[in-house]
Amino acid sequence: MFNKNFWTSIIIGCLFCTITYSGVNAAALDEETRTVALNSTETVVLTPEQVKRGKRLFNSTCGICHVGGITKTNPNVGLDSEALALATPPRNNIESLVDYMKNPTSYDGSEEIYDIHPSIRSADAFPKMRNLTEEDLYDIAGHILLSPKILPSQWGGGKIYY
């Protein structure tokens, strides 16, 4: 039926496509794309290194539950720009996301959820949060805010994309 060379070619082709198209190179992003909200009135330009670190830290620390900007435990609340802006308080800037990673609250802001959501405050129960620095949280927040610019329909778009 199919010979060994056929399957080898298929595997090599798949690996090539995966490596070539696996993501956007941080150095290739222009300054405008790397500009995100620092707080409600100021913006900041992430460095290519912050972009890379933020993605790596997000994937290793948050990606289990938030792969692709979704929330596995509550598919109604994602990490897309609209959901972050509509949260109470809004979580659509670096400072507010860092605050959330330190002391998370429910989407409507009515109750603290550090006992069920990983955070710096609950690092004893969620060991992946234990060694994160302020700089790490900043870079993770930057990744969350940058991702909708890079993957506009996929980030937070749900399982139809992943």
From Swiss-Prot:
It is a peripheral membrane protein. One of its GO terms (cellular component) is photosystem II. It is found in: Plastid, Cyanelle thylakoid membrane. Keywords: Cyanelle, Electron transport, Heme, Iron, Membrane, Metal-binding, Photosynthesis, Photosystem II, Plastid, Signal, Thylakoid, Transport. The keyword Acetylation does not apply. Its main location: plastid. InterPro entries: Cyt_c-like_dom (IPR009056), Cyt_c-like_dom_sf (IPR036909), Cytochrom_C550 (IPR029490), PsbV_cyt_c550 (IPR017851), PsbV_cyt_c550-like (IPR016003). It comes from the Eukaryota. The keyword Cell inner membrane does not apply. Heme c binds at C62, C65, H66, H117. One of its GO terms (molecular function) is iron ion binding. GO terms for biological process: photosynthesis, light reaction; respiratory electron transport chain. Belongs to the cytochrome c family. PsbV subfamily. One of the extrinsic, lumenal subunits of photosystem II (PSII). PSII is a light-driven water plastoquinone oxidoreductase, using light energy to abstract electrons from H(2)O, generating a proton gradient subsequently used for ATP formation. The extrinsic proteins stabilize the structure of photosystem II oxygen-evolving complex (OEC), the ion environment of oxygen evolution and protect the OEC against heat-induced inactivation. PSII is composed of 1 copy each of membrane proteins PsbA, PsbB, PsbC, PsbD, PsbE, PsbF, PsbH, PsbI, PsbJ, PsbK, PsbL, PsbM, PsbT, PsbX, PsbY, PsbZ, Psb30/Ycf12, at least 3 peripheral proteins of the oxygen-evolving complex and a large number of cofactors. It forms dimeric complexes. This is Photosystem II extrinsic protein V. It comes from Cyanophora paradoxa. The gene is psbV.
